[in-house]
């Protein structure tokens, strides 16, 4: 677990962190990333997609871990659409994992 965490992550996400560790084989290796600016008061974020279908969100300015998400397929595809990039076919297994996580309700943990 990272030590540079936001208060939100420290206080609200320990259950999800344990779940990811136990049932998703951990975070996995980051395979792609996107800068996302939703107008949050603390600024833009970096959303990193991992080989295990996890989206790791860090604050762009501070580098603090904000949250980890068990991705849904449309979340992943939205990043590519927003940047005008094609989804790399070699990463199709990540979409399959995201579909499975969605069916199993993992994204609600």
Protein language model features and the residues they cover:
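Ribonuclease/tRNase effector modules and their secretory precursors
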Residues: 1-109
């Amino acid at each position: 677990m990272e030590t540079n965490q936001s208060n939100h992550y420290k206080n609200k996400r320990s259950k999800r962190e344990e779940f990811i560790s136990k049932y998703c084989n951990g975070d996995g290796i980051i395979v792609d990333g996107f800068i996302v600016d939703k107008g949050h008061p603390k600024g833009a974020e970096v959303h990193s997609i991992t080989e295990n279908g996890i989206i790791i969100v860090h604050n762009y300015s501070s580098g603090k871990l904000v949250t980890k998400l068990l991705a849904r397929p449309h979340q992943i595809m939205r990043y590519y659409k927003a940047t005008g990039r094609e989804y790399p076919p070699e990463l199709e297994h990540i979409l399959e994992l995201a579909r499975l996580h969605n069916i199993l309700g993992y994204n609600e943990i």
